[in-house]
Amino acid sequence: NPAAAAQAQENIQSSPWSNRMEVVCCDFRKYHPEDKFDLIVSNPPYFVDALRCPDNQRCMARHTSELNYELLFGHSAYLLSEQGVISIIIPAEVERTVIDTAWKYNFHPHRRLHVFTKPGKPCRRVLLTFGRQSISCIEDSLYIEGEKHEQFTPEYIALTKDFYLKM
C-alpha cells in the first residue's frame, strides 16, 4: 500500500531513529533481502472473522486475510538472523493462537507484556517477543490508566512521553 508506506516514511523521518530504519513498499510474502534481520517489529492485522469495511486499504491493514499469523511467523523465520527476534502487539483474545503458531515455526516466547486499560478491566493487548532460543519468558503487566479516566500511570507516561504531546 503506497499511501501507508508514505505515511510510515513520514513518521520515520521525524523519529530519532530515522537513520536506522527503512520503509520498503512491497508484499511481505515477496520480500527477500540479501541480509537477515536481528529484529522484526509488527503490528499485524487484528480482525479474523470481523465484518469487513468498504475501504479496501483499511481492510487490508486491519483484517488477517492478507497477513495472518502463519504467514507472519513463516516468513519471519526466513528473514531473521539466527539470534533475531520478532516483537508483535496482538489482541489478548488471540494470545494462545499466536503462541501456538509461533511454536510451529520454532519461535519461543522471550517476553510477554499484558496491557490493561485500567485496574479491574480485562487485558486488551499483549506485546510479545519471540526468538529461536528456548529461554525463560519475562512476563509483566502494564496499566495505562489509574482509577480515573485519563489519569495515566507513571509507567505508561515513562514509556510513551517521547511519542505523545499530552504526556
Language-model regions: role of each:
Residues N1-S42, V48-C53:
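Conserved SAM/SAH cofactor-binding pocket of Class I
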